[in-house]
Amino acid sequence: NVFDEVLERLRRTGAVERVSWYVAGRSAYRRWIEQGAQATGEVVREWEVVERGRRRTTSPAEIAAWEERLGVDTLWPALVADRRMTLGRLAKIRQDYTPHRSLTELRGIAVETAETLWEAFDRARPDVVLGFVPVTVGDYLAYLVARARGVTVLP
């Protein structure tokens, strides 16, 4: 796992005090843990956040408040970046343009994810965020949260 390798190298330099995780793939996360990984620190599990978001009702004012806090015109790109949100979890395997979630669910997912990540940043107080290209709603919003808080992001 590339994150394990990067973390180990950073730990050897003494540059890491604590680590938090945002994990998007449930089965990959399970395999990682079964292989003996030590997910020290807080773990934000995307599938739990998405499920809470799907049940959440949001108002235009709440969405606007998050857009202002994150310094963006709209939260929509975070959802569009993650084709699983609009086209389902098999979107990367099968081409099917049937909408997978309602607009209400998507709004709830965006706000729930932003709120969860903002609170996780409050607890962790990170100096740096490591990630790949932001292709999940959480990756994208973590980047926006980090940027809004002045935290360095290393893709």
Features from the language model and the residues they span:
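Histidine-anchored nucleotide/phosphate-binding helix
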Residues: N1-G14, L141-L144
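Well-ordered alpha-helical segments embedded in enzymatic catalytic cores
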Residues: V2-E5, E112-T116
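Conserved nucleotide-sugar donor-interacting segment of glycosyltransferase catalytic cores
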Residues: T116-P155
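Gly/Ser/Thr-rich loops at beta-strand to alpha-helix junctions
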Residues: N1-V2, G25-Y29, F132-D139
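Conserved N-terminal ligand/cofactor-binding loop architecture of enzyme catalytic domains
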Residues: R9-E112, P155
